[in-house]
Amino acid sequence: MTRRFAHRLRCFLPVIVMGLLVTAEGCHSPFVQTIIDNQSDATLKLVEVDYPSASFGVETLAAHSKYHYRFKIQGSGTITLQFADASGKLQTSTGPELSEGQEGSLQIIIGRDRQVSWKPVLRTTK
């Protein structure tokens, strides 16, 4: 390696590194961080969240516990929650409209009276 080449490499290396960092920053997929928060005194069973184009869930969610999940919205539509309460009765709640490209957080709170509240903090990405 010649001195001239080594000098040019030292001069241009920071420019190359900055270019790679800017490119990497542009590679971002929008995800929704979700928490299902069971604030009731009973264990819930067959907890399922349906959102546009997919679903996720957990077989049981103990009283006063939380379930964390991250998903990507593909398509648009309403999100719903379904679970069986302690007596085995199926409960359903409809949440907010979701649109492809949204990201942020969503908290789904199941209260002591089995009432469900939805707390979305979502924004649309480019």
Describe the residue ranges of each PLM region:
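Bacterial signal peptide processing site
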Residues: 26-30
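Intrinsically disordered, low-complexity Pro/Gly/Ser/Thr-rich segments with frequent PxxP/GP/PP motifs
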Residues: 53-75
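A short, solvent-exposed beta-strand micro-motif common in secreted/extracellular proteins
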Residues: 76-87
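Extracellular beta-sheet/turn segments enriched in Thr/Pro/Gly and aliphatic residues
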Residues: 95-126
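Asparagine-centered strand-capping/turn motif at beta-strand->loop junctions
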Residues: 34-41
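Sec-dependent bacterial lipoprotein signal peptides
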Residues: 1-25
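Short acidic/proline- and small/hydrophobic-mixed sequence motifs that coincide with surface turns
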Residues: 42-46, 91
